[in-house]
Amino acid sequence: MGDNDQVTTEQRERSGRREQNKAENRAALLKAARTVFAEIGYGAAGVRDIVRRTDLASGTFYNYFKDKDEIFEAVVGELTGELLKRHNNGRAKATTAEAFFHAHYAVYFDFIVDDAELLALGQKNFTAIRTLLDKPDVRALALALNDDIRAAIAAGVLPNVDVSYLAAAMAGIAFEISIVMVARDPVDPAGAAEFATRLMMGGLDRLPRR
């Protein structure tokens, strides 16, 4: 191997280590932020609270995130990515309208309560989360729901109704019921999913067809 080849190899290795270090630092900050937001809430949390939960220098935060708002959005974005995966294995495979609605709500409500930290995050931050509903990561959930409804209509699983209205209704019901659900003790995701499903089924036959 010539000197130039060796230099190139060393440069690649250094670059690879730098990228890995960046990824690890970002992941550490996100993990710490999720914990802090769950414990004290978005309003009370500060950048210093987040950095203290890591081994990173205080200035490192700003290499990855502009401010508290941006890292909060990133935390919620990670969660929506996981929700999308679960919906792909839920409502997207439903063969009846009832199964479609139930899968949609069960995935959402179970996701919130399966993780104690995530449950606390939802309990303390629903107002802040509401402000992110138009952000790209969260909008991806709405787009996926619209796509799944269209596919279900095409497959005869759902009647041919207004897709946008139905998606908005489903998303709104999920979010608003989740706020009430997480405030209760004990939290009952199964009951919440059943209530939302029956509510949708009760109105489905009355919706105008297209």
What is the meaning of each model-derived region?
Residues 1-16, 110, 114, 143-154, ...:
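C-terminal peripheral helix-coil segments that are non-catalytic and often amphipathic
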